[in-house]
Regions:
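Short, well-structured alpha-helical segments that form the helix of a local strand-helix-strand
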Residues: 24, 86-102, 189-190, 307
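Acidic carboxylate-rich catalytic motifs and surrounding loops in phosphoryl-/glycosyl-chemistry enzymes
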Residues: 81-93, 254-258
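Catalytic-loop region of hydrolases
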Residues: 90, 95-104, 109-115, 362-384
Length: 384
């Protein structure tokens, strides 16, 4: 970000008018910038696509342990007085050797911990959402944030989860992807996410879902989408509410809801002709205006307004513009406008782009109760 701020003028940009945006891990990085004080002067607006993670970040001790395992695998842990930290030894390794070390080291990591942001007490004094909860973040930056309808379907497909899951298969699958529940909790989740909608949770109609995936598969991917504190609508709602409470000048939430039919993404889990899911990363081609990558007709036409929203926000902190359906600012259920938790639903067809209120409300209310509030949040504000 510092490099961009300093050098973007050479590319025709304005270093004092930067919008930072990213998707997935890139969205995580943008969230980090919102909480990282050194970044505050380097951008004016932020876009977080499928990146509102609320699962903490590695501690310095975690990172040091990971580095020690790399040293051990690379046989670089004893550098002697000339190389006490083993860095010179590591720098001599070729790319193939480094790759082999990384692959081997990955097998040693806990399932919930990879290479990522570190709470080092300097750049990040606490996990980003803990800082935002405490009001210790960049309150001057307007934010666009959102998710895809079926985020975790990508991972279930990519990792080969049985497409015809039964109830027992669901129970076995949830903890593999980070959603643990006792018997009482699991029973409550099953009621909330019932495929027949009796718990207040909406699925595509049976005629649209088809029979490629079983009912329990749909329930599993939606429980994970909204229950794992990283990607889905509930994490995104949690972030939006915190930003609103913290005083962010404008928050715009979206839900991308179109199953992409284009054949331009062979091998991408959940995309392609006949697709019925809207997996992780579905929105990217539309954000970049990639109509040529999309199926002709309504799908390709959706790219123009989606891209326009992003460009308008980057230019003036407001995604709205001539000819576009109105994208309301986010307000929570008690907001002055009384709009409820409003998102802009992005889909094809007449009325496909429209404000939607109280998205997955009962499920997200329950997921919020499952999330333990951080201790001593008030102390974090003093760090800023």
């Amino acid at each position: 970000m510092a490099w961009v701020h300093e050098h973007i003028g050479a590319f025709g940009g304005n270093g004092s008018d930067v919008t930072v945006f990213g998707e997935s891990a890139g969205g995580n990085s943008v969230l980090n910038h919102l909480a990282q004080k050194a970044s505050f002067p380097l951008y004016r607006r932020a876009v977080i696509e499928s990146g509102a993670y609320d699962s903490g970040a590695a501690t310095l001790a975690d990172a040091e342990a990971q580095f020690a395992s790399v040293q051990w695998l690379a046989k670089c842990q004893h550098g002697g007085s000339a190389d006490p930290d083993g860095l010179a030894c590591l720098r001599k390794l070729g790319p193939d050797a480094l790759r082999d070390v990384a692959v081997s080291q990955g097998a040693l990591l806990p399932k919930d911990r990879g290479w990522g942001p570190v709470v080092d007490g300097v750049a990040l004094p606490q996990a980003p959402l803990d800082l935002i909860r405490a009001g210790a973040y960049n309150k001057a930056a307007p934010v666009v944030a959102g998710t895809n309808r079926d985020e975790m379907s990508y991972f279930l497909i990519a990792f080969g989860v049985d497409t015809q899951l039964d109830e027992a298969g669901l129970e076995a699958t949830l903890p593999v992807f980070g959603l643990t529940a006792n018997a009482t909790d699991l029973a409550a989740l099953k009621r909330l996410f019932a495929i027949d909608g009796s718990g207040g949770y909406a699925y595509p109609p049976r005629a649209q879902r088809g029979d490629k995936y079983s009912d329990w598969w749909w329930v599993a991917q939606r429980m994970l989408t909204d229950g794992v504190p990283a990607l889905g609508a509930c994490s995104n709602r949690r972030l939006a509410r915190l930003l609103l409470q913290g005083g962010t000048p404008a928050v715009f939430n979206y839900l991308f809801a179109h199953p992409t039919q284009s054949a331009a993404f062979p091998g991408f889990p959940g995309l392609g002709p006949g697709s019925v899911t809207v997996p992780h990363a579905s929105e990217i081609a539309y954000v970049f205006g990639g109509a040529y990558l999309l199926a002709a007709g309504e799908e390709a036409a959706l790219a123009a307004p989606v891209s326009a929203y992003w460009l308008n926000f980057a230019r003036g902190a407001n995604p709205n513009g001539p000819g576009l359906p109105q994208w309301p600012r986010y307000t929570d259920a008690a907001g002055a406008g009384g709009e409820g938790d409003v998102v802009l639903r992005l889909d094809v067809g007449s009325g496909g782009i429209a404000a939607q209120r109280n998205l997955r409300q009962k499920a997200c209310d329950y997921m919020d109760r499952r999330t333990v509030a951080p201790k001593d949040a008030g102390k974090l504000a003093a760090m800023m």
